[in-house]
Amino acid sequence: MDYRNPTTRDYALKLVNKKSAGNYNIDQICDMWEKVNDKWTYVNDPQGGDYFSPASRTINLGLKGDCDDFAILIASLVEAIGGASRIKSAQSPDGGGHAYAEVYISDDKKKVDSLCKDIAQRYHCHSVHYSTDLEPNGKKTYWLNLDWSAKHPGGPYYKDTGSVVAYYPDGRWKKITHR
């Protein structure tokens, strides 16, 4: 993820609405997701393998690519404004795959519930989807789904076989067997 690249950082700043200004907040994430998702053109990778486009290149190409390119872009935009993100790679029951981004929202369930309520009001939806993860220190963390195929941030998750790997901006990765 090239979230420190000026193209990526500048684009992230352009996407945030004035009413969402201030310290990093969930409204900024929603602003970015909405605008990128609205302009996204899905285009497959070349035959014979995956191509992973850096966020700055995807921006320069006019927001075109496949699911992993969207995930890389959204995760990079989140990082560019001070958030924490990860990209999940999942396998489907039919052997296909999918990639999507998640944003860290909190380790405090009350705060998560409040953020989910705000998202539900913004998008007039009944449920907001997030995953949980148990950190090595025993702390439970909450991650909001930012999949391009969802109707809103926190939309339903991709149906996978349970084989999911989370990739972090610092190069770490781990297998995740739960949601």
Positions of predicted regions on the chain:
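A structural boundary/capping signal
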Residues: M1-R179
